[in-house]
Amino acid sequence: MSKTDESITNAEVKSKLHPRNKHNTRYDFKKLIAQTPELGNHVAINKYGIETLDFFNSNAVKLLNQSLLKFDYGIDHWDIPDGFLCPPIPGRADYIHYAADLLAKENNGIIPKGASVKCLDIGTGANCIYPIIGTCEYKWSWVASEIEPKSITMAKAISKSNNLNIDLRLQSDSKYIFDGIIAEDEIFDLTVCNPPFHASEEDAISSNLRKIKNLKGKKPQESNASFGGQHNELWCKGGELRFLKDMIAESINYKDQVLW
């Protein structure tokens, strides 16, 4: 079995994931299907005799996310529109756990928990995944920003239906990241962000096709809906590097209001 096949089909113990990550072991599809029966329509036995999912089917991935969020985090209602970014839950959980370790460094090695820990998610998307995991794992309170009105609407619906009390704020001016979001008297312990990676729509499309070709071995035209994402979720002028530089430059104005 190739390394690529292993990573996609086997889902053995994921040694590179954070020790506190709930997704360190192979997906238990029996339990996940019990949470979300429709997921069973997308689970099959591969040539190695292992239960697996078609991770290039956007609906299958969304159903997997729904089941993982319900089984591991108690999230009963989670849905996003077709064409919006559907993030891998294990990787996003890893981010939150390492962020918790970062906060522990300023707290005598103890991870701070509870609503007194205030976090800011820049560009939360329709999925609102960082605030969900941060709330469920550590009970942190969250403000989450987004420039896309439809994403805000969906994220608010997720928050309300699961009683998460996430404060979702629309960024009305896409030139800014923190301006218009952080209030004058607000203090945040942590800022998280999954920035747009690509520098243009063409870059995003090319990356999508490369992933399909390299990981699935199919011609690009055979599967063109594998990786979701709105343009603001996938690309911005100058790409990830430009976004982060802008973020750093603007953060100077809030150096006394944000710890990390």
Predicted regions span which residues?
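N-terminal auxiliary segments of SAM/dcSAM-dependent transferases
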Residues: 1-86
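Conserved alpha-helix/loop element of class I SAM-dependent methyltransferases that forms part
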Residues: 68-72, 90-118
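Glycine-rich phosphate/diphosphate-binding loop of Rossmann-like nucleotide-binding domains
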Residues: 139-147
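Phosphate/oxyanion-binding active-site loops and adjacent basic polyanion-contact surfaces
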Residues: 60, 87-94, 236-243
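S-adenosylmethionine
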Residues: 147-149, 161, 165-260
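Conserved SAM-binding loop
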Residues: 155-156
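Conserved class I S-adenosyl-L-methionine
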Residues: 112-126, 142-143
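Conserved SAM-binding loop of SAM-dependent methyltransferases across substrates and taxa
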Residues: 126-140
